[in-house]
Amino acid sequence: MNISRREFARLLGAGAAATAARPALSLARSTGAPANSLTGAGLVRLSSNENPYGPSARALESMTSSFPIACRYPDKNADALVDVLAELNAVEHGQILLGDGSGEILKLAADVFTGPVETDHEGTKGGALVVGDPTFEAILHHAKVNGAEVVKVPLNASFAHDLDKMLTAIKAGLVYICNPNNPTASITPKKQLRDFIAKAPDDTIVLVDEAYHHYADSPDYESVIPLVNEHPNLMVARTFSKVYGMAGLRCGYCVAQSSTIERLRERQSWDSVNIMAAVAAKASLEDADQVRNGRRLNSEVRAFTVAELDRMGFQTIPSQANFIMFDAKRPVVPLIATLKSRQVEVGRLFPAMPNYMRLTIGKKAEMESFLAAFRQIVAIAPA
């Protein structure tokens, strides 16, 4: 069916208005499992650590309002977003770089700071990438494409980054620390991370990925953005894909010293953040309920899910994110496939932990669907 732009705007505007009329903005929407042709009718999608409650009503309204300026490049709107981010993070405008999701930030970091080590009249370029194992794999891919050496350091017994061993493994280049970590949802304690950043060599960039920052409530966790001005080799990545519910819009950012930002900007495409993403991100930052309610709903449903798994005899790594990782007591690859055949999509295999399953925390009805399917499967084929 073909619809005009006017009709499309009317439909989206009606949806935003309906959302705004509901209590607690978008995060108080129905908790039923989705049955939408755009996502797959009846598919319970618990595989990508998305926010099932979606963007805030203010973000939806801002997107609708931005339709008439879709003919314009996003420079002014992007600058307005950077201004807000700089103020929120107590840094200068030139210390923020927007990205097409935080994924673009990770790629830029790999492009600039990793690769075969070469020395010319401008100095030494390239370097190795040091990461925890397991962790989010995207930056490993980018570094390998660049021809860089990738050094994997296993997580410690608490599923935190083993920072002492990572420090020993450092070679000029880049260290990537995802905190809270994906896929384990675990944190690296704040004092250990502060000490690591202070000890890291000047010729090595420390990239801390704080995609799941808003979900972390442990007293042993803190953002390292306040340390950026003290450490020229520190950069921090953030995203609007998680608690802000904008995974499909693609908007993220980096906080670092201005000299680092300029090196990244040289490799970046112009206007990589579209105008809808920019206005929606700015509106999201002005909606305190989005974060507050998102954290509350995630915490409630996560606690329910962990308790049910514990009742079944499956132990979960303590989670500080919008997903969990638990010991399935058997190889997860067959479980992933069998769950998919029952319309439940869970996280992929992480080879360093072949018996552990990563599971996004969806709405309660979605988690009940997962638990029902999982109970049936493990009853048929016990470990």
How would you name each of these model-derived features?
Residues M1-A28:
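N-terminal export signals
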Residues R22-C71, W270:
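C-terminal segment of N-terminal export signals and the immediately downstream linker at the start
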Residues A80-A128, N146:
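Phosphate-binding glycine-rich loop
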Residues G115-I177:
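PLP-dependent aminotransferase-like
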Residues K144, D162-K171, P183-V206, E210-V243:
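Active-site pre-lysine segment of PLP-dependent enzymes
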Residues L155-A157, S299, E308-R342:
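Conserved PLP-binding catalytic core of the aspartate aminotransferase-like
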Residues N233-I317:
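PLP-dependent aminotransferase class I/II
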Residues T338-R342, F350-A383:
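PLP-dependent enzyme catalytic core of the Aspartate aminotransferase-like
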